[in-house]
């Protein structure tokens, strides 16, 4: 994968990519970071540094270039993991204060919630009470992901579903989406509050 990413980057900038900085999740320890660095070297890359994704985010937004000092929070909800990190930033330096999260909480959980809702609505509409086969499951996941994205800008989204020779048009609203994923969002907020509280105990206030 790293070799492919480096190759794609080389094509984009029309220059060979050899020296790299690789990002990793905030919860990665020494063993995981070493394994990541080794993977980069196996891919033929010169790994200059392994840095955490929150640090990379702070660098990207230019926090370290600003004058003065500040404490910032990076909320990182990925496809399969969630991390929240508090960092103290000063000119030329980024220091991690604390980190929290859930390695099994991510966008996939939101997709699963939408899938379950759509499947339930489909069964109610058609009377189907069996299991979705592999093809129907894959189709359902793709449509759930698309519906989730569309609900960012729309109040409701219609979804055409097919399974076991049956077809039905079901609908999901933004309000319903918020309701079925509320527990997931609250979990991330609780982790965020815990990180903020721990940072405060250590003398740092987010501004």
What feature does the model see in each segment?
Residues 7-207:
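Oxyanion-binding/catalytic loops of NTP- or PPi-dependent enzymes
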């Amino acid at each position: 994968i790293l070799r492919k990413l480096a190759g794609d980057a080389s094509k984009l900038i029309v220059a060979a990519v050899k020296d790299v900085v690789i990002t990793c999740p905030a919860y990665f320890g020494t063993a995981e970071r070493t394994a990541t660095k080794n993977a980069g070297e196996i891919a033929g890359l010169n790994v200059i540094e392994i840095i955490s994704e929150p640090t990379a985010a702070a660098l990207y937004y230019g926090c370290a270039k600003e004058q003065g000092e500040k404490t910032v929070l990076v909320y990182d909800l990925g496809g399969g993991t969630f991390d929240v990190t508090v960092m103290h930033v000063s000119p030329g330096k980024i220091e991690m204060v604390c980190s929290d999260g859930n390695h099994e909480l991510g966008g996939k959980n939101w997709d699963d919630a939408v899938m379950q809702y759509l499947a339930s609505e489909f069964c109610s509409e058609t009377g189907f009470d069996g299991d979705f086969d592999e093809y129907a499951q894959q189709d359902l996941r793709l449509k759930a992901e698309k519906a989730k994205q569309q609900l960012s800008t729309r109040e409701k989204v219609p979804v055409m579903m097919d399974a076991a020779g049956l077809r039905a048009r079901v609908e999901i609203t933004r309000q319903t989406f918020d309701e079925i994923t509320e527990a997931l969002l609250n979990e991330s907020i609780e982790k965020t509050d815990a990180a903020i509280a721990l940072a405060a105990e250590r003398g740092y206030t987010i501004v």
